[in-house]
Amino acid sequence: MQKASHKNKKERGVSNKVKTSVHNLSKTQQTKLTVGSLGLGLIIIQHGPYLQITHLIRKGAAANDGKLQPGDVLISVGHANVLGYTLREFLQLLQHITIGTVLQIKVYRDFINIPEEWQEIYDLIPEAKFPVTSTPKKIELAKDESFTSSDDNENVDLDKRLQYYRYPWSTVHHPARRPISISRDWHGYKKKNHTISVGKDINCDVMIHRDDKKEVRAPSPYWIMVKQDNESSSSSTSSTSDAFWLEDCAQVEEGKAQLVSKVG
């Protein structure tokens, strides 16, 4: 009986040690954040199967709250358990949340370390910086500095002056130029206008071979008659020669008739 009680005490001690170790590994932190114009104010990366906070955006909801820290791993956002979520799935979840919504955020603290490449790049993250609006006084001071610097550098060579010349700030907004489509520029059909010269000269593209002494004669009715007879006859060479002979005879007869009419 004493041995059995001693074993039970040992098992209880081991179980208590396991519980405390598990509790240390799963140390959690919980807070409530109000969604603002900057969202939750968190910069999150996907570290393996987890979503880990790397930086807090200045003046964001998380930075103003002060309870979340870089390195925390997200457990749940609102009613959604985000363990195993990808960044794409997490973004789809946040798209349905409007500004002013209060979300309960639950994270693991001291669970995994931030990757080394993400620890010292705060200055390279554009979301962590905010644009500083320049006043007209600052613009005037910048212009004065540019003119004084150009006066001090009068002894500098002309090439260096052109190379390192500081142009004054310009407040005029220039519209962005629409980029040219590569497919249209490379594969587009380009129309080319080609002119073709037609004439009697040898240098023309199309040369007309024509004798001005001979008049252009209209087709004779005799040719039609002989052509119809030619379809029924077997010899084509004799019919064509007869046709030209009949046509010439007809023109000779017409010439004689005109001479007789003039004489009379």
UniProtKB/Swiss-Prot annotation:
Superkingdom to which the source organism belongs: Eukaryota
All copies of domain PDZ, residue ranges: 30-109
Pfam families: PDZ
Official protein name in the record: PDZ domain-containing protein 9
